[in-house]
Curated annotation (Swiss-Prot):
Role, per record: Aggregation substance allows donor and recipient strains to form tight aggregates which allow the non-motile bacteria to maintain physical contact over a period of time sufficient to permit conjugative transfer of the sex pheromone plasmid from donor to recipient strains.
InterPro entries: Adh_isopep-form_adh_dom (IPR026345), AgI/II_N (IPR041324), Antigen_C (IPR032300), Glucan-bd_C/Surface_Ag-I/II_V (IPR013574), KxYKxGKxW (IPR022263), LPXTG_anchor (IPR019931), SA_I/II_PAC_V_sf (IPR036234)
Species this protein is from: Enterococcus faecalis (strain ATCC 700802 / V583)
Protein name in UniProt: Aggregation substance
Motif (LPXTG sorting signal) on chain: 1261-1265
Residue numbers carrying Pentaglycyl murein peptidoglycan amidated threonine: T1264
Protein family membership: Belongs to the antigen I/II family.
Biased composition (Polar residues): 100-117, 125-138
The UniProt record lists the keyword Signal: yes
Topology with respect to the bilayer: Peptidoglycan-anchor
Propiece span(s): 1265-1296
Ranges of Basic and acidic residues composition bias in the record: 89-99, 160-178
Localization terms from the record: Secreted, Cell wall
Amino acid sequence: MKQQTEVKKRFKMYKAKKHWVVAPILFIGVLGVVGLATDDVQAAELDTQPGTTTVQPDNPDPQVGSTTPKTAVTEEATVQKDTTSQPTKVEEVASEKNGAEQSSATPNDTTNAQQPTVGAEKSAQEQPVVSPETTNEPLGQPTEVAPAENEANKSTSIPKEFETPDVDKAVDEAKKDPNITVVEKPAEDLGNVSSKDLAAKEKEVDQLQKEQAKKIAQQAAELKAKNEKIAKENAEIAAKNKAEKERYEKEVAEYNKHKNENGYVAKPVNKTLIFDREATKNSKVVSVKAAEYIDAKKLTDKHKDKKLLISMLSVDSSGLTTKDSKKAHFYYNNGAGGTLVVLHKNQPVTITYGNLNASYLGKKIASAEFQYTVKATPDSKGRLNAFLHDDPVATIVYGINIDPRTKKAGAEIEMLVRFFGEDGKEILPTKENPFVFSGASLNSRGENITYEFVKVGNTDTVHEINGSKVARHGNKVYSKTDIDVGTNGISISDWEAVQGKEYIGATVISTPNRIKFTFGNEIVNNPGYDGNSMWFAFNTDLKAKSITPYQEKGRPKQPEKATIEFNRYKANVVPVLVPNKEVTDGQKNINDLNVKRGDSLQYIVTGDTTELAKVDPKTVTKQGIRDTFDAEKVTIDLSKVKVYQADASLNEKDLKAVAAAINSGKAKDVTASYDLHLDQNTVTAMMKTNADDSVVLAMGYKYLLVLPFVVKNVEGDFENTAVQLTNDGETVTNTVINHVPGSNPSKDVKADKNGTVGSVSLHDKDIPLQTKIYYEVKSSERPANYGGITEEWGMNDVLDTTHDRFTGKWHAITNYDLKVGDKTLKAGTDISAYILLENKDNKDLTFTMNQALLAALNEGSNKVGKQAWSVYLEVERIKTGDVENTQTENYNKELVRSNTVVTHTPDDPKPTKAVHNKKGEDINHGKVARGDVLSYEMTWDLKGYDKDFAFDTVDLATGVSFFDDYDETKVTPIKDLLRVKDSKGEDITNQFTISWDDAKGTVTISAKDPQAFILAHGGQELRVTLPTKVKANVSGDVYNLAEQNTFGQRIKTNTVVNHIPKVNPKKDVVIKVGDKQSQNGATIKLGEKFFYEFTSSDIPAEYAGIVEEWSISDKLDVKHDKFSGQWSVFANSTFVLADGTKVNKGDDISKLFTMTFEQGVVKITASQAFLDAMNLKENKNVAHSWKAFIGVERIAAGDVYNTIEESFNNEKIKTNTVVTHTPEKPQTPPEKTVIVPPTPKTPQAPVEPLVVEKASVVPELPQTGEKQNVLLTVAGSLAAMLGLAGLGFKRRKETK
C-alpha cells in the first residue's frame, strides 16, 4: 500500500439506526501506534473515480435472491483445482489450497434460496456459531515470558575484575627482593556469574585473594632464608680456594727452584689424570672380548718347567687355545690375576674395567676400556700371546717364541684407552688440560741389541725427565744406550724399582686427544733369546716430579632466584535479562489473531537492562535489539521506528501502561541515541557509543523499540522473535504469531454451452476459432470469523481484444451463503444486481460491489463464514494464437493479481492433396492415359488438435472425418488400397469407418471414436492414400479435391487435375505395306493377299503416366481371311532405347514386339524394352505411337468386316471397323483334289539384321504360331519382298 505520510487513513462502517456511515480512523505517528485514537466519528462517503461509466449486466435480476439461468448443474460444488487455474509467480498470487470447500459454489451451481443444496447446509453446520449479540472483536492471546533457558540464547556476559588489596600489598613487598621476579598470570576466570549472585561471589573472591597473599609472603621468606645460607657457604668456599691457590703457587715456585735437577722436567707438569694403583685398587674386569683365548690349565700342564710369566707366554700356543674366556683366567704365582689371550695381527682385543675411582680434573672416571691391536709380531701366523692383568695399572704382558738363532725380531701393539664417567659418557681431555700418563720401565741394552719403546702421535707431547736415558727419537720414545747390563755404567739394578732412580728408564707423555699410542720391543741383534716378550704398564704413576694441579675446592653458588606468580580474579557477569515482544494493532494485543493484507501492526520489543546496573558501565560496549521479520509477509518503514527509555518498574506486557508512559512523556524518546539499520529482513537498533566504546545511555532501564509493519499479500502464519544484544551475548524474547488466511483471487476459462457455463477448465487447452467461451473471474476468500471491514471489493479484467471479443454478456454469483437484508442468498445465487461494471472500450472491464452489498458484507452474520464471489463474462475467439488472461482484485485498495489462464487457438487446418503416378512422382497437371493409376495423396492436418484440445467447446457428434470427391466418370477407385497412416508411417486404417458412394464418386473416412482419435493422433499430419485407375475410352480433364472435417469445421484441400487426351487408334486396309491407298470399302479378289493396317493411339507429349502394357488383338474372320504369318511394326516417332540406341521415325521395330496367333486372333504385344523406352524421361517431350501390319489372304467371297482391339495398360478399346467385298468366282469344273500335308515347322524368316552401336536388343525375330504349333513366317521378310529395306534401323554415326 502506498504510504504518503505517517497518517494511514482507513474507513470503518458503523450502523447508525438503519443507515451505514463511514468514519475515518486515524493512526498518527508512533504515539498512535500504541493507542492514540480520535474520538470524533464523522460520516463519510467512499471515494469514487470521476468519469466512471457503470452498467448493469445483460440479465439484471429484479429479485434479490433469484438464481441465474447461466450456470450448468453439476453433481457437487468444487473449488477450482490446479488443473484449471495455474498459479502465477509467487509475488503475484499464492497457489490455491487443495481440496474442496464445501460451502463454496462454482458456476455450475444452480442453488436458489428456496432450494438450498446439501453443500450449503453442511457449510452452515460447520461454520462456527457467533451470537448475534456478541459485538466484541477477537482478543489476542496473552504473550508468554521469554524463558531464561533458551537454546537460541548466546550467553550475555559483562567482564568483571575483582579487587585484590591483600595480594597487591604482598606483591609490592616481594618486588623489593632483587632475587624475586614477580609475574602476574592471567586473571583466574571464575566463569559466568549471575548478576543476582554477584555479591556472594565477591565475598568468595576476597577470601581467595587473602589466601594467595599469604602464600606470596611465605614464598618470599623461604627464598630469603635460602640465599642467606648460600652466602655463608660461598664465603667458606672462597677461603678454601684462596688457600688452594696459595698452595699451588707455592708448589710451582718450589718446583722452579729444582727444575734443572734430575727427576724433574723442564716445565712443570700438572697431573690432571689420576689413574694409579690407589685409584684402581677396587677395579673389576667387566668383560674381555677376544677371538681366541689360551687354556690356562693346558698351558701350565705343558710348560711346567717355565716359572716366569714371560717364559710361559714365549711359547707356541698351538693346541692350547680355547673359546671359553673363563678357562683362560689365570693367577700367576705372585698372586696377580689376568686373562690369557691370543692376539692376532690387526684384530682388536678389548678389556673393560669397572668400579674405578680414577679422575680427570676431579671428575670421576668410573670405567675404562683398553683395546689392543697387534701391528707387528715375529710369529709367522701373526700371533702374540698375552696376559691381560685384572689390575688395569699392571696392564699387559705379551710374549712369543722365537728361534734363538734369529738375529732380528720385534713386536708392536697399538693401545687405545677410553675413559667413561658415571653417566656412561666418554671423558675426553681439553687442549689446556691434556691427559698426562707415564711411559716407564722402558728397558734397553742399546739400540743395536734390543730395546723397548713407545710410539706417539704428532699431537702427543713427550716430556723428557732430567737425568733419564729415554728420549724421543722421531715418533719412538726409548733409550739408545744400555741401561740394563752396565756396559755404559748403568745396570737395571740401578733404577728398576729403585726409589728416586726410576726416572732413568722413564718419560712423561701428554695428549689433548683420546689416548692412543703403540708400544713394543725391538731385537736388533739377538743375544740368544728364545722368546720375544715385554711387560707394559699403563698408569699415571709418573717417574718425574710433578705438580698437583690447582683444583677449586668448590665454586661459589649464585643466589637462588625465584619467580612468584600471582593472579587476580575475573568473572563474566551474566545479567538476568528478560526482553519481551508484543504485537499490537495500535490499541490492543493481537497476538495469535488473523490479519489480512494491508493491515498495520506494530511490534514492541523491550530491551531489559535492569541487572546491567550492577556492572561497570564502561564494560557495556554493545546494547541493542535485533528483530528479524518475515519479509515475505510484512514490510517496514524504518523512518517510523522509535525507541523509548522507560523506568525499570514498567510492566511491558500491559500495553495500556506502555501507551500511558509514552503519551505522558514518562518514557523518553531516545531514538536519537540509537543507530537504526535495515538489512533485508532484519532491523537492528543499537545504542550509540562513547569514545571509550561504552554505550551512551545508562543501564538499569527498559528500552522500548516500536516497529511499524504492514501485512503483505502472502498467506500463512508468520512468527516473530527478537533478540536483545548485550556485548557479545544474545537473549531471545518470547515469540508472537499472526495468521494471514489465503486471499488469492483466481482466474479460469470455461466452455460456453449455448449460454451455459461449462464444467471443465479450458486452461492451457486448444480452442477453435469463432468459439464462444466464458472467463471465470473469481475473488479471493474473505476468511471466516473476520474481524476487519470490507471497504472496497472489485475485480478488473483486461481482455486481449486482438484475440477475444467481449459479447457484452456477463453475470455474477455469490460463492457462499450471503444474507442481504432479510433474505439469504444461497451459494451460486446471481448477485449481478449488486455489481457495477465499468466498461472501457469492451477491453478494460472492472466489476465492483455497490454500497448495499458492502454494507451487507459488514454485517456480523456475514462475518461468521467465508465470503467470495465470481463473475462470468462471455467472449468470442476471433483470432488464432496463444491468449493469456489475468484478473486483478482490489480489496480495500490492495491490488492482487490472480493466476494467469492460457488458451491456444491454432491456425485453421491446412490439408493438402497431390496426385502421383506409380513411381510416386507428382503428376499434377500432367497428361495421363487410360489404365494409368492416379494415386491421390492427401495430408490430414491435425497439428492444431492434440491432447490439449478443448473437447468441451465442440459437438463431439459432428465427428472427425476426411472426404474425397473423385471423378467417377473418368477414374475407378482401387478401394482395397485406400490407406490412412500416421506421422510415423504406421497403418491406422482400421480406426476408421470408410463409406463409398459410387454413384456420386465420394468416399468418407470417419474416426470411429473421435475424441480417442484426437488424443491418439492429434498434433500430427496423417497421410491418406486413394489410388484410382483411369477408365478406358475417356478423355478430358479429371479433377480431384478432398475436405477435412474436425468437429464441424470443414476445410477443403487444394484441387489437382490431370488431362486425358482423346483416344485415337485407327484401322485400315492396304494391299502393300506402305501403300497410301486405302482399300476400306473396296473389293478384294478371291485369293488376293493384302494387309490390315493398325495405327495405335498416341502417347501424348509430356505424358505423366507409366506405360505398363501395350498390345493389339485382331480377331480375323477366318472363314474369309487366312493369316499369312506376315506382320511388322514401324515407329511413328523418334525415340531412344534404355541402352542409348536411337530409333528413328519409320524404323522397323518388330523386334521390340512379339506376336502370337491363337484361335484366329493375331496379338501383337510391346516388349518390356519398348515399354521402358516409352517411360524414359528423354522420350517424354514428344508424342509416340506405332503402326502394325498383319498379312492375310482372302479365301472366301463375301463382305468381310474387321476391327482391332487396342489394350493400353490393360484398358481395351476398339478401333474403327473396316470392310472389304469379295465377289464369288465363276463356276468352273472342279479340279482334282490334292491333299496338302501339314506345313512343317519352319524357322522364322529373319528380319534384316539391325546394325546398332550397342548390342542390347536381341536380334531374334518375333515368334508366331497357333496352339496346334503351326508356325507362320515372319513378316520381317516382307520388307525385303516389298523393297522396304530402307525402313530398317538407321545406324548411328560415331564421331571418332
